Structure formats: structure tokens, C-alpha cells
């Protein structure tokens, strides 16, 4: 049984049988039509959030993980694609997972997506890891869909409980001291990895500074040093900054998400950085594939690809025969 103390001080326990039932209900819809909703109770969601929040705070802000592990990028509420990722990679605990953030917003099923991820975090705290993305932030997900989904299916209270949980998510992970993972990218304020370890939690995401950059910055092919970012937040950084950073910290690779890429993954700076994006047909507007990066015991990286659904298939699925 996992026990958590809420901010009010009363004990809330999530019984392991309750947790298993939540996971069962959330995963059995993979056998149904894509898009079928799973409506948990408000009490169950609160238990997931408060229990996961405690685990996040017990674990470091810079996670230190070991391979083998599978790394996934943005999901953005595309729940049926999240279930496809687990079908490809193996449902926990058959594989270790690290997700790089942006679980909510834009897609139709942010609630199912984040609830399953939190449930797996609670069930397998030493094998399943979640980082914070720039959308795990009240000021962003208030606008891009998650708030509206919470309000439509529950109430604003539920959204606030998620906000408290998101404010405690770790922001980076180091795999075998060689692969540094975060949602966005590098920062001009990052001189030592201890600066990540020492970032405060719980916290909102500030408009500038190290935490902001880790979740918002982007690589820029034509940039030397640090450049302006078209997002209006943080910076872009050139291949020179990636090389400099890896050399200084004796690292092999930076792994990040945050940008849709056509093949689901894309290398940068002579394979010193990789972008992984795991939401195929992003928003129904892009023809991109989704990818998951598998890191084996020897730190060899390979990619499993979720192809974008063909338009024809989508049409046939929605047609009664």
C-alpha cells in the first residue's frame, strides 16, 4: 500500500488493489475503438496525484538512471498512441521507461494519458520515470486544452490537483553518467549538473533562467552560440554549444523532445543530440511518425517507430460495414 500525506495533513492511502484496478481499466480500452474514454472518479485522480507527488519529491530533480531503458518524447493527450507505444515496447514492468514530458494539451485524452503514467509511476517507482515538460505548467495547460478537459469532465479542483503534482516533477535524467535527458534543451545558465539537482521543488516554471531553458530551449542548425527563440521564450543553441557541453561534462549524448520531427526522431550536431517525439500524426495536422528510443546495456541507441495512421485506415475505421 502506498501512503501519502496531503497538504491538509490528513492521510490518503492508495490501496494496491485500487491501483491495479485503475491500471486495468485504463489499459483494457486498447481492445476497444481508439478514443474510448475511461472515467476515473475524482477521488481516484486525487489519490494518483498526491501519491505520485510524494514519490517525485522523494526522488532527485536530476534522476540518475541505468540502461537498458526506453525513452519517449511528447505524447500530448494522444492516448491511443501511448497504448501503442506500450504494445511495441512492452507494458511495464517488462521494460524500463523514461518519458520526457508534455503529457497533456492538444490531444483529446490528456486525462487518460496522465492518469496511466502516474499510475505506472506509483506501481513501479524504480523502473518508470516521468520528466516535466513545458506543458506541465498551469499557465500553459490553462490555454492549450488540459484545463478545458478537466473542467468538462470533472471540475477546476481536479485541474488544481494536477498542477500541484506537476510542480513536483523532476526536470532531467542522466543515464549511466553518459546520456543527459530533458524536455527542451541546454541553458547558458547551466555550468554544473549540481545546478539542476539544486533547483527548488515544488515550483512553477519561471519565464527565464535554468529551469525555463531546460523545458523550453531548442537546437538551431544555423545558430552559433546562443540565439533568439521563435517561441518567444528561452533560446536556441548551436552545434558548438552541444559539443562544448558534452566535452565539459564527459557526456556522449543529449536526448530531448519538444519539437515535432518527421520521422519521430532526428539527430543534430553530428549525432551529439537527438530529438525524440512520440505523438504520430501530431494534432491530426502533421504527417509525422512517432518514435521511442531504446538504450541497451552498452548505451547503443535504436529507434522503434510508430508510423502515422494512413488516412484510408482512419476512414475505414469510422465507416460501418
From Swiss-Prot:
The active site is at residue 135. It is found in: Nucleus; Cytoplasm. Expressed in the vasculature of roots and cotyledons, tips of leaves, guard cells, bases of trichomes, pistils and stamen filaments. It is an enzyme of class 3 (hydrolase). Keywords: Acetylation, Cytoplasm, Growth regulation, Hydrolase, Manganese, Metal-binding, Nucleus, Protein phosphatase. SMART domains: PP2Ac (SM00156). It catalyses: O-phospho-L-seryl-[protein] + H2O = L-seryl-[protein] + phosphate; O-phospho-L-threonyl-[protein] + H2O = L-threonyl-[protein] + phosphate. Mn(2+) 1 binds at residues 74, 76, 102. SUPFAM superfamilies: Metallo-dependent phosphatases. The keyword Cell inner membrane does not apply. Binds 2 manganese ions per subunit. Its EC number is 3.1.3.16. The modification N-acetylalanine is found at residue 2. GO terms for cellular component: nucleus; protein phosphatase type 1 complex. InterPro entries: Calcineurin-like_PHP_ApaH, Metallo-depent_PP-like, PP1_catalytic_subunit, Ser/Thr-sp_prot-phosphatase, STPPase_N. Its cofactor is Mn(2+). Interacts with the DELLA proteins RGA and GAI. Interacts with PIF3 and PIF5. Interacts with the auxin efflux carrier PIN1. Serine/threonine-protein phosphatase that possesses phosphatase activity toward para-nitrophenyl phosphate (pNPP) in vitro. Acts as a positive regulator in the gibberellin (GA) signaling pathway to regulate plant growth and development. Promotes the GA-induced and proteasomal-dependent degradation of the DELLA proteins RGA and GAI by directly binding and dephosphorylating these proteins. Involved in the regulation of phytochrome B (phyB) signaling pathway that controls photomorphogenesis. Belongs to the PPP phosphatase family. PP-1 subfamily. This is Serine/threonine-protein phosphatase PP1 isozyme 4.
